[in-house]
Amino acid sequence: LVELAEKQQRLLSIFHNRRWDGDFLTVRRLLAEGALGQVAQFESHFDRYRPEVRQRWREAGGPGSGLWFDLGPHILDQSLQLFGQPDWLQADLGKQRPGALADDYFHVVLGYGEMRVILHGSCLVSAVMPRFVVHGSQGSFIKFGMDVQEEQLKEGKRPPAADWGVDPAPGQLSQIRDGQLVQQTVAGEAGDYGAYYRGVCAAIRGEGENPVPADEALAVMALLDLARESDQQGRRLPCQKLSD
């Protein structure tokens, strides 16, 4: 597709819509502001309680099936947006539900020097778990709940509704100031999937950059495959640049 787009002189853009999740935008802003200092640990969770295996292709065990290929692209892309290419990764993929044919659990660790990025997903988590947990040299941020845009669409809402993308659950920011722990709630940024389409429109018109160029999607695909290889080999694997 990349070669065809170049040959036909067309724009090729990938729908990594979760770059515009409200909770992710909030985390991105806090990191850009240096609110947590030097990040030491970043956790991104997609935990669910779906104990029954359903009859659908995502759970049938064929090519492209499984929780890692379903949710991994989203949280890998978000991690790459924040921190760039990792030095190494180690993955553990599992089939935990009775009768599961495709992986329904993943725990993937990305190494960036001494910093660790943890990507975790499961279908057997009944407790309310945080979506993001970030620890740094000057504080921590914890955010519960999922971005609301998908549910709003299912309810028939459309932008520009007044509450579009507005997350009702604030995050918890804990900072060390003058040696004292200070805690406060942080209202989330409004999610905005429409920003992707506006970006594509601007790129087609020559008025802006491609919001998600193909090479960024290829980097995600390479890490998805590398994680499967890591799981199969049971060891940490180095991450090479896509050009390598």
Predicted stretch roles:
Residues 1, 27, 223-227:
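Aromatic/hydrophobic pocket-lining residues that form π-stacking "cages" and hydrophobic walls in ligand
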Residues 1-7:
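Catalytic-core regions built around general acid/base machinery
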Residues 8-13, 18-99, 107, 234:
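Predominantly a Rossmann-like dinucleotide-binding segment in NAD(P)-dependent oxidoreductases
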Residues 20, 24, 72-79, 144, ...:
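A structural signal for well-ordered alpha-helical scaffolds and beta->alpha junctions
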Residues 63-69, 160-166, 186-187:
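A short acidic, glycine-rich active-site loop
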Residues 77-161, 187, 194-209, 225, ...:
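Contiguous beta-strand/loop segments that form the cofactor/metal-binding neighborhood of enzyme cores
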Residues 165-244:
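C-terminal helical cap and adjacent loop that interface with cofactors, partners, or active-site loops
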